[in-house]
């Protein structure tokens, strides 16, 4: 991207006449999707009444398969894993929970198959059961190293590798296992058959714990079909489920795209990123299940308007204009728009309209839950206050300390705001007490924010310094501690790893709030890992094109 300085005539409340204001703004590429999702993308030729009837029949067969596992649960962990990775576990939550509880209570320590032990550990931890990592000590030799014989068990090493990503702080054996499996899986990769090599290659780049559920489902459908022991009923059910959900997602995206088109962002706010499709993809990552349809639409609107706010504060508006905008958002009153420049009025009125729409929907369904919108508004106000603080630093050429920077930057990731907004879709599960908890910077939301902030800084700090922009965490750390860029990035990556461990720990029973709330935070963090792992995939959306297409555009062949 290139740096562009544009002189745009605007009128503000402090100017009686229109005058040219020099603005430093980056030139972002336009949406790569055009009007694609405005078209009718129905799967009508694939999904009709007879297919839905077939789907229900397959669903009951899969349910029976899972229930029958109670007879020999420890031998059937692979089926539970497949059901979940194929993305259909949400149909059978109670049945899976029953099987895993039996697996947990019936366990004996005489199992010496690495794949079985590691798979059991991962599945139980994924469900909040705090099993001990000491079970992996028996795979070490007399010198305390993992046995070299394990190198010949590629499937077992892969299973152990995946299990290590459920670790918490202080579990040294899992840290050692991660180093051992990463090194040796990379070493044996060229010698393996195509099927297993593909799984390992994908896992080394995207472990299950950090992968978005929809992407994992689409990826694993192809992998599962090549396994010798695959179940035809389960595979066909997963394919139909994926396509039926994709049809629903396309209809929602069509609604969102029409709404976005009505705002005419590309013309009226040309300095901003036009990324509504990527915003929707992000929210499908947070919750993909059909019951969250309205929540997905509203969350997409929230993240899209937040993106406009981000670009306005970060990339276009003057400090004076932003003081007025921040004050208006603090007031949260439509009358406050009168003090804003014309281009800001679009953003401000849209922001209020989105939350009003959410409020009206909740009032229709359950008035007692209206408190939830209050918390969503309040955290948005915190975000714009933090945006403004960073603008003041930028305009005063001030490099904050890391402590100052992180206090603001963890808010401007928007992770706390998106977490609290995502709880709106959970309705009565998210109680007033749970919102209070979420508003007090709990460990899991802070950890998610750290992952987002540091991963974003690692991939974008060089570009950010090519324009007038607040110092990133990398520059703040270098100035405060005299470290090299390489040292800072290494440290940040370690902090991201530790933050994931904190996320994992907060998801172990007993949990501070219901698990569905924690799952939203985990999924938001997974989205960050996908978007920012190697580059800024939101700004440079070509990077995410294949991901978006696989989930939202291209059906699974049936």
UniProtKB/Swiss-Prot annotation:
InterPro entries: Isoprenoid_synthase_dom_sf, Terpene_cyclase-like_1_C, Terpene_cyclase_plant_C1, Terpene_synth_N, Terpene_synth_N_sf, Terpene_synthase-like, Terpene_synthase_metal-bd, Terpenoid_cyclase/PrenylTrfase
Enzyme class of the recorded protein, top EC level: lyase
Positions that bind Mg(2+) 1: 310, 314
Catalyzed reactions: (2E,6E)-farnesyl diphosphate = (1S,8aR)-delta-cadinene + diphosphate; (2E,6E)-farnesyl diphosphate = alpha-copaene + diphosphate
E.C. number(s) listed in UniProt: 4.2.3.133, 4.2.3.13
Annotated binding of Mg(2+) 3, by residue: 464
Gene Ontology BP term (one): diterpenoid biosynthetic process
Keywords: Lyase, Magnesium, Metal-binding
A Pfam family: Terpene_synth_C
Cofactor binding note from Swiss-Prot or TrEMBL: Binds 3 Mg(2+) ions per subunit.
Motif (DDXXD motif) on chain: 310-314
Family as reported in the entry's similarity comment: Belongs to the terpene synthase family.
Name the UniProt record assigns to this protein: Alpha-copaene synthase
Organism expressing this protein natively: Ricinus communis
Taxonomic classification: Eukaryota, Viridiplantae, Streptophyta, Embryophyta, Tracheophyta
């Amino acid at each position: 991207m290139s740096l562009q300085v544009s002189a745009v005539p605007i009128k503000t409340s402090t100017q009686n006449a229109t005058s040219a204001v020099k603005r430093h703004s980056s030139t972002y590429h336009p949406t790569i999707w055009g009007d694609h999702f405005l078209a009718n993308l129905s799967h009508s030729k694939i999904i009709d009444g007879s297919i839905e009837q077939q789907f229900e029949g397959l669903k009951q067969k899969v349910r029976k398969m899972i229930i029958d596992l109670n007879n020999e649960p420890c031998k059937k962990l692979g089926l539970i894993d497949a059901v979940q990775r194929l993305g259909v576990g949400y149909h059978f939550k109670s049945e899976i929970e029953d099987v895993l509880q039996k697996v947990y209570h019936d366990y004996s320590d005489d199992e010496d198959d690495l794949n079985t032990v590691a798979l059991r550990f991962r599945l139980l931890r994924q469900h909040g059961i705090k099993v001990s990592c000491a079970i992996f000590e028996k795979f070490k030799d007399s010198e305390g190293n993992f046995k070299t014989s394990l190198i010949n068990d590629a499937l077992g090493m892969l299973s152990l590798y995946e299990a290590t990503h459920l670790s918490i702080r202080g579990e040294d054996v899992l840290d050692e296992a991660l180093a051992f499996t990463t090194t040796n899986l990379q070493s044996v990769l060229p010698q393996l058959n195509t099927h297993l090599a593909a799984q390992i290659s994908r896992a080394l780049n995207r472990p299950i714990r950090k992968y978005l559920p929809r992407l994992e489902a689409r990826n694993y459908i192809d992998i599962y079909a090549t396994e010798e022991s695959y179940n035809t009923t389960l595979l066909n059910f997963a394919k139909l489920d994926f396509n039926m959900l994709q049809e629903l997602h396309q209809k929602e995206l069509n609604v969102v795209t029409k709404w976005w088109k009505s705002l005419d962002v590309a013309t009226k706010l040309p300095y901003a990123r036009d990324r509504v499709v990527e915003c929707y993809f992000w929210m499908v990552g947070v919750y993909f299940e059909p019951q969250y349809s309205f929540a997905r639409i509203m969350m997409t609107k929230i993240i899209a308007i937040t993106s406009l706010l981000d670009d306005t504060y970060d990339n276009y508006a003057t400090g004076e204009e932003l003081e007025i905008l921040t004050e208006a958002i603090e007031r949260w009153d439509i009358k406050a728009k009168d003090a804003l420049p014309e281009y800001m009025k679009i953003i401000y009125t849209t922001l209020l309209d989105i939350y009003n729409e959410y409020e009206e929907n909740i009032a229709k369904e359950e008035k007692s839950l209206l408190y939830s919108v209050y918390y969503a508004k309040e955290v948005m106000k915190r975000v714009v206050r933090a945006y403004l603080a960073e603008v003041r630093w930028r305009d005063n050429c001030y490099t904050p300390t890391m402590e100052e920077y992180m206090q603001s930057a963890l808010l401007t990731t928007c992770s706390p705001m998106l977490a609290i907004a995502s709880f709106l879709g959970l309705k009565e599960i998210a109680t007033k007490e749970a919102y209070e908890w979420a508003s007090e910077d709990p460990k899991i939301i802070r950890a998610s924010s750290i992952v987002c902030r540091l991963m974003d800084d690692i991939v974008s700090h060089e570009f950010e310094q090519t324009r007038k922009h607040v110092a990133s965490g990398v520059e703040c750390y270098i100035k405060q501690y005299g470290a090299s860029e390489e040292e800072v990035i290494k440290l940040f990556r370690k902090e991201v790893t530790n933050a994931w461990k904190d996320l994992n720990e907060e998801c172990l029973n007993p949990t501070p709030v219901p698990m569905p709330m924690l799952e939203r935070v985990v999924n938001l963090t997974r989205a960050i890992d996908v978007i920012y792992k190697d580059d800024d995939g939101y700004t440079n959306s070509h990077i995410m094109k294949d991901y978006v297409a696989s989930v939202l555009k291209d059906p699974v062949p049936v």
